Amino acid sequence: MKKKALLSFFIIMGFFISACSHQEDMQNDYMFKEYNKGDKIILNSVNGGSKTLIRTDKGFVIEGEENKVLMIDFFGTFCSPCKEEALELSKLWKNNSKKFTIIGLTHFEDVSDETVKKFADDYGAYYFLSNDLQNDRIIAQILKDINYQSMEQLPFKVVMKNGIYQKLSNYWDNNTSTNFYLGKIPTDYIQNDLDKIYKEK
């Protein structure tokens, strides 16, 4: 019994170490103008280039890359787990680039593009990073789409295929599935989920 209690304690502690919460005044993320099907959102990356998100019935796709699995990552330049996983996410993206893409959205902060670019350079985040004013609205829409009711923490990721949120393995509870990754998740764990998603029609 003591071993089980001790194990549970370490799992919970590991979770809090692997995620950043934000204690500022948290606005109700459901108080926003929802996107309509077909709405287009142009995002610019601090690493160069732009992508257009298109609203689907239940999610988003990237214009011109509709056939790719899309991961949207909420992150902060202040967030230690976000820094720690950035290079690994870059490798994940490069290793899967024909079938998969990542869009990182800054959240919980108001910083310059230069600050986000420095984060990218310092920690190897070479995938698409948006520091756009529209980020919070996109994030609010995603949280409403998946009916997320808990405190927001970073990093936070969702995965979509054909504009539909995918079921993902729950790193913190192996007996359940979920539709988001919360906290720093090993990329080999994410890769296993991606391999399953690729095979599904």
Feature locations, PLM:
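N-terminal targeting signals for export/organelle localization
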Residues: 1-52, 167, 189-201
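A short beta-strand-turn-helix
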Residues: 43-70
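C-type cytochrome heme c attachment motif
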Residues: 77-84, 156
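Short, internal strand/loop/helix patches
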Residues: 120-162
